[in-house]
Amino acid sequence: MSRSTKKGPFVHARLLKKIEAMNASGNKEVIKTWSRSSTVFPQMVENTIAVHDGRKHVPVYITEDMVGHKLGEFVPTRTFKGHKDDEKSNKRK
């Protein structure tokens, strides 16, 4: 179920404040955030945001194609290490 249109898209207030301050100063630095549920706004384009994946912050460079999506969509939280090998298939006859 999607968010109500009367509420508008969600973005963490402090994150948006940092982005606007960076755009005004022209400074390009990585911003750390834990807010994976924040929506990517047009003001964030061409900035790098380090999104937390539960263990570390992963840097994500924001492009125009990402506008409207959530920050958490671009950082996977689980690492797939492969299926466990069956011991029967490892034995030679």
From Swiss-Prot:
Domain of life: Bacteria
Pfam family for this entry, one: Ribosomal_S19
Keyword field: Ribonucleoprotein, Ribosomal protein, RNA-binding, rRNA-binding
SUPFAM superfamilies the record matches: Ribosomal protein S19 (SSF54570)
A Gene Ontology biological process term: translation
RNA-binding found in the keyword field: yes
GO MF, one example: structural constituent of ribosome
CC annotations in GO: cytoplasm; small ribosomal subunit
Ribonucleoprotein recorded as keyword: yes
Similarity remark: Belongs to the universal ribosomal protein uS19 family.
Chain's role: Protein S19 forms a complex with S13 that binds strongly to the 16S ribosomal RNA.
NCBIfam families: rpsS_bact (TIGR01050)
Family matches, as PANTHER family: RIBOSOMAL PROTEIN S19P FAMILY MEMBER (PTHR11880), SMALL RIBOSOMAL SUBUNIT PROTEIN US19M (PTHR11880:SF8)
Protein name: Small ribosomal subunit protein uS19
Organism annotation: Clostridioides difficile (strain 630) (Peptoclostridium difficile)
UniProt gene name: rpsS
